[in-house]
Swiss-Prot record:
Organism (species): Chlorobium phaeobacteroides (strain DSM 266 / SMG 266 / 2430)
Region (Disordered): 547-575, 595-640
Basic and acidic residues biased stretches: 547-569
Job of this protein: Acts as a chaperone.
Polar residues: bias regions: 603-615
Gene name tied to this protein: dnaK
Name of the protein in question: Chaperone protein DnaK
Family matches, as PANTHER family: HEAT SHOCK PROTEIN 70KDA (PTHR19375)
Length: 640
């Protein structure tokens, strides 16, 4: 069996890692970066770009470049009104679900996420030199059941068997504590990423990683800080020029990139100048945006976001039954923890300097890889005890939510409770499964509904209906209801909001494989053309250098083969290019043998080579990386 890779599927960036022996390794992508932008773009020519390639063209193609798709995963259309307004791409309602409309096709958030996962899968395969089919994927600790199911579906579409869904702060704690298995400490993991915020309190000791409580906000992250800067820039420009740049998709994308850059710069500087020339134009001519932003101004306009950070911290500490003074370390995770004000808030709340020993962009993927190693048996003496982030229950008489599993219950877990009918001679009951912390059913999230029928008629309150909630190690819920009198049972694995059917997933998997095949075909085409270009160049160079030394009866065949290769490179298929290259090489072999056999012939004529690695990059040899034609002089034993 192959390796189980660990993937941090982030809102802004994604990262993949794998266990190499006893140590986790973060894998660089094809661009040489250890993180990959969580972006997908569709070009006018029909190409699909993922990662850095998608990010590079976002300004000129905003309507067809998808980012922050994680904010839509597992959520209904009416649950994302704010996210919908901020996205430059079209979000449409399809059967109550949020879909991304690109040209004439509507993509589910799971499909877009799968494209990013495919990129991470390919990155791992290129590094390992073998196929990868199994993964541990991380999610925010405060993701609900629907969002976890949707993430698992995305993995299936990408061709991955998702062995475990693991909470991001828990993964970070694994990475932080792997070499501290013999010590005992209480740790708070403060995870502020691109789109979500989690805070988890854990106890580490003797290789056991036990989550005591978790809390968070799935609507709070780096994107929200960026949006504050975007609105500030747009408002300032509107005051100066009377033009609202938010109505121009390309200008808005430029504002987004500038806002992200300014936010990063303000982490190390107290002010920054945002300079966007030719941001728009009027009859008077082009307009330029030049605005100075100070760190103090940034912190003031984001004050409400900073306030929102503290609320989950209070709840997490309270629910953990751990005193703040007893917390030994506060580990910072997520790129947004680099914001100085965030670090100051953490220090003020916990009364200690936060621990910055881990890489906030990579630590979650590292933890996922460690969990993969645990599942494979490569990592021993590690036990992970995670929790269910939200309470789970059913609707009972009066529209009340009756909880069966409380928030922060260690998982996996199984809870049973007996209920009865609300009316005389009632022969069926509807089980309305809910997730949330509010007392009334209507204020919580519906995970699913199912019916248990054929209950024998009886007075109200007499039948005994046993309801069982079962949460697996991925935090995914199954529910069953059983009539204790008849033994009749009905059960469901919650098919929650955004859950795709098996048929839909299989279709999307086929589409994903087709795209992978198309991508491979395009790469082969590019590689063959690059190789052909190299061969054409070296052939023409040899023809010029050898000149009249080439026999006159051989030159037409050589030039004809060269022209044939040029034509194939312009208009031919990969196969025709390879055939033309073979033909040219064959003619050169014939010419070379004639040159060697000619009386007094020099021996530096050889078949031209393309000297490329198939991707257009020149192969290097020797100490200085230059490719040279070496000339050899034959000498005798006396050095003459």
């Amino acid at each position: 069996m192959g390796k189980i890779i660990g993937i941090d599927l982030g809102t802004t960036n994604s990262c993949v890692a794998v266990m190499q022996g006893t140590q986790p390794t973060v894998i660089e992508n094809s661009e040489g970066n250890r993180t990959t932008p969580s972006m997908v773009a569709f070009t006018k020519s029909g190409d699909r770009l993922v990662g850095q390639a998608a990010k590079r063209q976002a300004i000129t193609n905003p309507k067809n470049t998808i980012y922050s798709i994680k904010r839509f995963v597992g959520r209904k259309f009416d649950e994302v009104p704010n996210e919908k307004k901020l996205a430059p791409y079209d979000i449409v309602n399809e059967g109550g679900e949020a879909r991304v409309k690109i040209n004439d096709k509507a993509y589910s958030p799971q499909e877009i996420s799968a494209m990013i996962l495919q990129k991470m899968k390919q990155t791992a395969e290129d590094f390992l030199g073998e196929k990868v089919s199994e993964a541990v994927i991380t999610v925010p600790a405060y993701f609900n059941d629907a969002q976890r199911q949707a993430t698992k579906d995305a993995g299936r579409i990408a061709g991955l068997d998702v062995k475990r869904i693991i909470n991001e702060p828990t993964a970070a704690a694994l990475a932080y504590g792997l070499d501290k298995k013999q010590s005992s400490e209480k740790v708070a993991v403060f995870d502020l990423g691109g789109g979500t915020f989690d805070i988890s309190i854990l106890e580490l000791g003797d290789g056991v990683f036990e989550v005591k409580s978790t809390d968070g906000d799935t609507h709070l992250g780096g994107d929200d800080f960026d949006q504050k800067i975007i609105n500030f820039l747009a408002d300032e420009f509107k005051k100066q020029e009377g033009i609202d740049l938010r109505n121009d998709a390309i200008a808005l994308q430029r504002l987004k990139e500038a806002a992200e850059k300014a936010k990063v710069e303000l982490s190390s500087r107290t002010d920054t100048e945002i300079n966007l020339p030719f941001i728009t134009a009027t009859q008077e001519g082009p307009k330029h945006l030049v605005i100075n932003l100070t760190r103090a101004k940034f912190e003031a306009m984001c004050s409400d976001l900073f306030d929102k950070i503290l609320e989950p911290c209070h709840r997490a500490v309270k629910n953990s039954s751990v005193e703040i003074k007893d917390i030994d370390e506060v580990v910072l995770v997520g790129g947004s923890t680099r914001i100085p004000k965030v670090q100051a808030l953490v220090k003020e709340f916990f009364g200690r300097e936060p621990n910055k020993s881990v890489n906030p962009d990579e630590v979650v993927a590292v933890g996922a890889a460690i969990q993969g190693g645990v599942l494979k048996g490569d990592v021993t003496d590690v036990l992970l005890l995670d929790v269910s982030p939200l309470s789970l229950g059913i609707e009972t008489l009066g529209g009340v939510m009756t909880r069966l599993i409380e928030a922060n219950t260690t998982i996996p877990t199984r809870k049973q409770e007996v209920f009865s009918t609300a009316g005389d001679n009632q022969t069926s009951v509807e089980v309305h499964v809910l997730q949330g912390e509010r007392p009334m059913a209507s204020d919580n999230k519906t995970l699913g509904r199912f019916h248990l029928g054929d209950i024998p008629p009886a007075p109200r309150g007499l039948p005994q209906i046993e309801v069982t909630f079962d949460i697996d190690s991925n935090g995914i819920l199954s529910v069953s209801a059983k009539d204790k009198a008849t033994g009749k049972e009905q059960s469901i694995k919650i098919e929650a909001s955004g859950k795709l059917s098996d048929a839909e997933i299989e279709k999307m998997k086929r589409d994903a494989k087709e795209h992978a095949a198309e991508d491979m075909k395009k790469k082969e085409e590019i590689d063959s053309k690059n190789a052909a270009d190299g061969l054409i160049f070296s052939t023409e160079k040899q023809l010029a250098e050898l000149g009249d030394k080439i026999p006159s009866d051989k030159r037409p065949a050589l030039e004809g083969a060269l022209e044939k290769l040029k034509d194939a490179t312009k208009n031919g298929t990969t196969e025709s290019i390879k055939n033309a290259m073979d033909e040219l090489s064959k003619v050169w072999n014939d010419v070379s043998s004639n040159l060697y056999q000619a009386p007094g012939a020099e021996t530096n004529a050889s078949e031209p080579t393309q000297n490329t690695d198939g991707s257009g990059h020149t192969k290097k040899s020797g100490n200085d990386g230059e490719v040279e034609n070496a000339e050899f002089e034959v000498i005798d034993g006396n050095g003459k």
